[in-house]
């Protein structure tokens, strides 16, 4: 009896019981990991002065070590930047709509292209995908795996015409001059508009003007897409912070209601989240649909474009241009490091997967990066972010005056740095006693991800200013 009680007690307080970030009182272990990034960052600063006082030689070696590590990273950054830029440039030249349509008749198109030579981006991979679809399911490796009941997974490849895109654009108090170009970019996409469900999630806190904007957009685009759905996110809902995540989550729940009414299969709907200033490449939706079809494990994938902060780059003040270009370079580099790629800003994920895991977190400011960890833990490690090598263009920070612009830029960078909150979210699960039993995740792969997460935030906070 005692053992059963003990087992129940351990299960009750398991870190794996919920995907949500705890609010209010946290455990000592959780607080330790919350403190860890800041403590390490301060330690690196303080250590430089302490070592210099104890021994100038040791202090010099410590500083040289930091500079040497940074130099090695810089070489890798240059290489990945050039590689990523070339990939993005070549991918933008591909007619992804044509490639998607070629999946309708894979056997015929494989015979036509199997001996063809082309320098087009990922042309050989496209031919292999046609072969995979034309030969049949028996040769698909993932079909040979067994599920938890000892049966083979059913592998299917949906037809291009069966795919629906649901685009969720969220906004707070932005004007029509910002909102309309974003909707227009989706409208001008090479993907068929009548298979795009556009959801506009706006905040009640945005006031009467935002409600008018939503009404205008709904009327203006009512006949453009399969459906244009304005959704007002009520203010002051329980267990929510003020941020993008709750708005996105609320809009997604309304989307689910609509999809059910239309009898559209959840498994064939891909959801893309957009900020109000995002302008997607015309190929983006076709590119995502293509990758969605050719990957049998599609429900356990999300699709990450390259975010470039260049919409208003020549209007922004010089300091903001430098930061915007640096952030754009970082995203280009990330697209070439698929083993470390995480969700950032705009991204796409299957509706079926989102509905099963409870959509996005309503308790974190950085809902995009946090979504990676939610998905990873929900799928017990069987989750991956697939790079989409075309851009979604965003605004560089710009306000009415230089002082306001600098303040807004600081707030944006600070908001991104809140991603350090994921260190505790990941750490408590990594070092939990029931990680193997309930999380079904191996220690070393998760430890490597945890260390990269921790190192990234410590580097940003401590090493960058020191160098």
Predicted segments, located by residue:
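Short, structured coil/loop segments at alpha-helix boundaries
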Residues: 23-31, 51-63, 123, 193, ...
């Amino acid at each position: 009896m005692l053992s059963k009680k003990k087992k129940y007690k351990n299960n009750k307080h398991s870190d794996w019981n919920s995907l949500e970030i705890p609010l209010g009182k946290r455990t000592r272990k959780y607080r330790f990991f919350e403190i860890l990034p800041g403590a390490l960052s301060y330690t690196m600063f303080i250590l430089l002065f302490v070592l210099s006082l104890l021994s100038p030689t040791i202090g010099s070696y410590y500083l040289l070590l930091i500079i040497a590590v940074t130099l090695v990273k810089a070489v890798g950054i240059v290489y990945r930047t050039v590689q990523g830029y070339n990939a993005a440039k070549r991918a933008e030249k591909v007619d992804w709509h044509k490639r998607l349509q070629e999946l309708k008749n894979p056997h015929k198109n494989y015979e036509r292209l199997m001996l063809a030579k082309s320098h087009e981006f990922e042309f050989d991979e496209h031919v292999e995908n046609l072969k995979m679809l034309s030969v049949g399911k028996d040769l698909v490796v993932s079909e040979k795996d067994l599920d938890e009941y000892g049966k083979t997974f059913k592998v299917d490849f949906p037809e291009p015409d069966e795919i629906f895109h649901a685009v969720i654009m969220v906004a707070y108090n932005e004007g029509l001059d910002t909102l309309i170009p974003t909707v227009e970019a989706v409208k001008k996409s090479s993907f068929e508009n009548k298979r795009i469900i556009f959801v506009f999630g706006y905040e009640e806190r945005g006031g009467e003007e935002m409600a008018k904007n939503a009404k205008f957009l709904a009327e203006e685009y009512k006949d453009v897409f399969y459906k244009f759905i304005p959704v007002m996110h009520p203010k002051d809902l329980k267990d929510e912070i003020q941020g993008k995540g709750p708005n996105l989550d609320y809009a997604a729940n309304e989307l689910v209601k609509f999809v059910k009414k239309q009898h559209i299969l959840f498994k064939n709907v891909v959801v893309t989240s957009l900020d109000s200033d995002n302008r997607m490449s015309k190929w983006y939706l076709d590119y995502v649909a293509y990758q969605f079809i050719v990957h049998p494990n599609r429900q356990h994938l999300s699709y990450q474009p390259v975010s470039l902060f260049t919409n208003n780059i020549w209007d922004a003040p010089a300091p903001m241009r430098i930061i915007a270009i640096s952030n754009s370079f970082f995203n280009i580099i990330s697209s070439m490091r698929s083993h470390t790629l995480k969700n950032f800003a705009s991204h796409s994920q299957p509706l079926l997967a989102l509905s099963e895991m409870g959509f996005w977190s309503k308790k974190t400011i950085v809902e995009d990066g946090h979504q990676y960890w939610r998905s990873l833990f929900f799928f017990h490690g069987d989750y991956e972010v697939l790079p989409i090598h075309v851009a979604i263009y965003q605004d560089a920070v710009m306000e009415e005056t230089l002082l306001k612009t600098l303040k807004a830029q600081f707030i944006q960078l600070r908001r991104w740095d809140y991603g350090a909150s994921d260190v505790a979210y990941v750490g408590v699960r990594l070092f939990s006693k029931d990680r193997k039993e309930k999380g079904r995740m191996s220690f070393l792969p998760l430890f490597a991800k945890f260390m990269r997460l921790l190192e990234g935030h410590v580097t940003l906070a401590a090493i960058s200013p020191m160098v």
